[in-house]
Amino acid sequence: MGITSLLLGLTFVLNIALAISIIFLERKDPTSSWAWVMVLLFIPILGFFLYLIFGKPISNRKIFSWDKKSRLGVKTTVQSQLRLLEENQFEFNQPDLIEHKDLVYLHLKNDEAIYTQNNGVDIFTDGQTKFDALLEDIEKAKKHIHIQYYIMRSDGLGNRLADMLIKKVNEGVEVRVLYDDMGSRSLKNSYIKRLKRAGVMVEAFFPSRFIVNFKINYRNHRKLAIIDGYIGYLGGFNVGDEYLGINKKFGYWRDTHLRVIGDAVQSMQTRFILDWNQASRDTILYNEDYYQTVSAGNVGMQIVTSGPDSEYEQIKNGYIKMIMEANDYICIQTPYFIPDESLRDALKIAVLSGVHVKIMIPNKPDHPFVYWATLSYCGDLIQAGAEIFIYQNGFLHAKTIIVDGRIASVGTANIDVRSFRLNFEVNGFLYDSEVVNRLQNEFDADLEKSTQMTRKLYDQRSIGIRFKESISRLISPVL
């Protein structure tokens, strides 16, 4: 027997073992499971390595560690809020929010997401104003600055941020920067070294330590900034010149980001600390300076996170619950729309129940297969009666859901399998009609810059586009 035959035989045996593991042990979504089984069967050698790199699930063992004091504090608050909700004694500062107590309960039970209602919220839809505000807050920092982004670039904006962080370190402010190793793969080593030499603590999430990174498919997609424990930022903007709208390929960059002052920032801080402690040997312990109580409004909020290590798909479950609670309308903005069957059915049921569903997607792809799959799934919703709008004023990157003008979600999670099952994500769920109406006004303004994809237009698409959609939809479970 030749070496080639031996290797082929060994690969066949290993692929059969992997296929059995995928079907019986890993408890993947059936569609995803069969997609990987087909890859292993039809391209056995390449498929074997593709699965090891992109398909192997992360350990169910929690990869994030809490110090006992922080853990006890969160647990105590969560149990107290759950009990009050169960006994109908929870006091919402806006009485009509009692109608959404089940959503609050879900996030408490599902993610230990504490409900806070003393928050002030600013909304940014433009990168220039968002980063001007962030840099101004950083410049005023007195104690600490915690920065976390999926993508960081060593370009004009990246260097402006670096200059400001170095300035604050020289003033005695503690500065930590956490970036995703894959998302920030273009970040220059000289940029990182410059920060470290100045005293900025810098860490990469799931870095490539070997030739093959077996965690490459599991990325930290979160974008957080916490300043002095009471100002927090979260949303869709990363750090790079394209997010300022000066990239010729994408043009204007339309995103949504929140600036929060209030107790919700404590949950954002905890999330940063957990992520930092996973990535760094320099473990952050409980520090009262990290958790400041400042009231700046009466906006109700829960900071909800999810990831491949989660037992449940917390953010996706929150999306579905919001859709289920809708009585009048649902407005969605997402750059990628590849819903799994559960979310797709929830939207169809809402439409067929008389709820007006509007979904806005970009008019240009940054990931072609994802874009064509998005169009395919939008076609399903068009047939059910949803309205699909194509944003024409640049690139739409916002991840926003608005329901009935009363509740909303803004964050990093797209409506796709990657965000629900493979990426570490963070969203803010908002319970406040005034803030939600501000988000609604932004959505309505975007409608003026969009064109509707009607049933007639969708049915007129070319054979080439139909072919691209079919292929992209077929592989969408592994995108």
Curated annotation (Swiss-Prot):
<dbReference type="GO" id="GO:0032049">
    <property type="term" value="P:cardiolipin biosynthetic process"/>
</dbReference>
<comment type="function">
    <text>Catalyzes the reversible phosphatidyl group transfer from one phosphatidylglycerol molecule to another to form cardiolipin (CL) (diphosphatidylglycerol) and glycerol.</text>
</comment>
<dbReference type="Pfam" id="PF13091">
    <property type="entry name" value="PLDc_2"/>
</dbReference>
<feature type="transmembrane region" description="Helical">
    <location>
        <begin position="34"/>
        <end position="54"/>
    </location>
</feature>
<dbReference type="InterPro" id="IPR030874">
    <property type="entry name" value="Cardiolipin_synth_Firmi"/>
</dbReference>
<feature type="active site">
    <location>
        <position position="228"/>
    </location>
</feature>
<feature type="transmembrane region" description="Helical">
    <location>
        <begin position="5"/>
        <end position="25"/>
    </location>
</feature>
<dbReference type="InterPro" id="IPR001736">
    <property type="entry name" value="PLipase_D/transphosphatidylase"/>
</dbReference>
<keyword id="KW-1003">Cell membrane</keyword>
<keyword id="KW-0444">Lipid biosynthesis</keyword>
<feature type="active site">
    <location>
        <position position="221"/>
    </location>
</feature>
<comment type="similarity">
    <text>Belongs to the phospholipase D family. Cardiolipin synthase subfamily.</text>
</comment>
<dbReference type="InterPro" id="IPR022924">
    <property type="entry name" value="Cardiolipin_synthase"/>
</dbReference>
<keyword id="KW-0808">Transferase</keyword>
<protein>
    <recommendedName>
        <fullName>Cardiolipin synthase</fullName>
        <ecNumber>2.7.8.-</ecNumber>
    </recommendedName>
</protein>
<feature type="active site">
    <location>
        <position position="399"/>
    </location>
</feature>
<feature type="active site">
    <location>
        <position position="223"/>
    </location>
</feature>
<keyword id="KW-1133">Transmembrane helix</keyword>
<dbReference type="Pfam" id="PF13396">
    <property type="entry name" value="PLDc_N"/>
</dbReference>
<keyword id="KW-0677">Repeat</keyword>
<keyword id="KW-0443">Lipid metabolism</keyword>
<feature type="active site">
    <location>
        <position position="397"/>
    </location>
</feature>
<keyword id="KW-0812">Transmembrane</keyword>
<feature type="domain" description="PLD phosphodiesterase 1">
    <location>
        <begin position="216"/>
        <end position="243"/>
    </location>
</feature>
<dbReference type="GO" id="GO:0005886">
    <property type="term" value="C:plasma membrane"/>
</dbReference>
<feature type="active site">
    <location>
        <position position="404"/>
    </location>
</feature>
<keyword id="KW-0594">Phospholipid biosynthesis</keyword>
<dbReference type="GO" id="GO:0008808">
    <property type="term" value="F:cardiolipin synthase activity"/>
</dbReference>
<keyword id="KW-1208">Phospholipid metabolism</keyword>
<feature type="domain" description="PLD phosphodiesterase 2">
    <location>
        <begin position="392"/>
        <end position="419"/>
    </location>
</feature>
<dbReference type="InterPro" id="IPR027379">
    <property type="entry name" value="CLS_N"/>
</dbReference>
<dbReference type="InterPro" id="IPR025202">
    <property type="entry name" value="PLD-like_dom"/>
</dbReference>
<keyword id="KW-0472">Membrane</keyword>
